[in-house]
Every structure is written in C-alpha cells, then in structure tokens.
Amino acid sequence: MIDYTKTLTTTSKNKTFDEGLRRYMLKVYNYMALALLLTGVAAITTISVEPIYHLMFQTGFGTIIMFAPLGIALYFFMGFGRMNLQTAQILFWVYAGLTGMSLSYLALIYTGTSIARTFFICSSVFGAMSLYGYSTSRDLTSMGSFFAMGLIGLIIASLVNLFLKSSSLSFATSLIGIVVFMGLIAWDTQKIKSMYYIAGNDEVGQKLSIMAAFTLYLDFINLFLYLMRFLGNRRD
C-alpha cells in the first residue's frame, strides 16, 4: 500500500526547499545587480563631475583608486570567516564604488554606445551561463577546476604581455578570457546553489549571499572587460 501521507510530506518539503532556494538565489542576484548599478553610477559621476575627474586622472590619487579594489577583494575573501554581516556588506559596496571609479577610463577610450551595447551583450551571456549552471544536473566541478587553472594561466600571460606588448598574445588572452569567465559563471552559480544547503536565514546565510554576489559580480566585470576589447568602438 502506498503511504500517501509520506509522499505528500516529502513533496511539501521539496516545494519548501525550492521556494527557499529561489529566494536565496534572488537575493544573490539582487545584491549583484545593486553592485553593478553602484559601479555604473560611480563611473558616470567620476567622468561627469570635474573635481572628481581631476582627482582621478590628474593626481596620484587615481593610482591608489586603481589598486584599492584588489586589496579590498583580498581582504574580503581571506577574512570572510571572521567578519560580520555589516562589514561584509560595506566592503562589497565600497569595492563596487571604487571599481566604478577605476573603470571610468573606459568612457575616455570607447564610445558610450559601444559600452552600453557591450554591457547588454555581457548581461545576456551572463544570464545564459548562470541559468545553465543553476539548472544543469551535471556536476561542473571538473570543468570549474579546468577554468580555474585557465584563469591562473590567463593572469600569467597577461603579466608577461605587459613586457612583450604583443598584439597576438593580447588577442589570444582576450579570447581565452571570455571563454574562461563564461565557464566560471556557470561553475560559480552551481557552487552558490549548493551553498544553500549550509545557508539559512541567520547571519551565516546572509553573509554567504554577499560572498556569492561578490563572486558573480567579479565574473561579470571581468567578462565585460574582455568583451570590450572585441566590441568596443574607440573614440576618434
């Protein structure tokens, strides 16, 4: 005889889990979207407001701003376990704002139309890869490890090209960069989905959603920068 009570209970639990997972992922994407919005506002403000523009591009302060996000990211991920929710949120927003100031130089190199077009293309690619990572039943761990190693190789190649200044190597690293970050978006999304098992509605769960949003934000920004090398139209 079929135990319908047990079946209904299991179905109810699965439904509750699915709804909780959707809320968790929505929170992650909302954090990420707000960070991207803050980045855009910071970039536009830096270019548009004369005192900030002068500070960024005509003083040594701009160099500090350029490297500050790297320090914040290292501190965030290395010290994440020890920091509270408020600190994690503040660091994320500060990082997004400083990144916007750092990337404002793109408006001096590329046309606004091509920047907007690349952003929407990047958003579409990100959405497709994140959806794949969320919905696939395939374990992406091995693929993620491959792309993580590819990222290390990409960093090394980029550093080498600072001295070689090879256009061919630059083209190759840009193309590889697009592929690597497309793969990382899918892998990171799957990891974030699995993080829900240990995330609750307490502060730990809130912190994990911030870290997840930070990770996807970094994937998006890097994919955008590599796409700009191919799709950006330079100003005359």
UniProtKB/Swiss-Prot annotation:
Residue spans crossing the bilayer: 32-52, 61-81, 90-110, 115-135, 144-164, 167-187, 208-228
Membrane topology qualifier: Multi-pass membrane protein
Localization terms from the record: Cell membrane
Keyword entries, A-Z: Cell membrane, Membrane, Transmembrane, Transmembrane helix
Keyword Cell membrane carried by entry: yes
CDD domains for the chain: BI-1-like_bacterial (cd10432)
GO cellular component, one term: plasma membrane
InterPro entries: Bax_inhibitor_1-related
Keyword Acetylation assigned: no
Pfam families to which the protein is assigned, alphabetical: Bax1-I
Family: Belongs to the BI1 family.
Protein name per the record: Uncharacterized protein RP147
Native organism taxonomy: Bacteria, Pseudomonadati, Pseudomonadota, Alphaproteobacteria, Rickettsiales
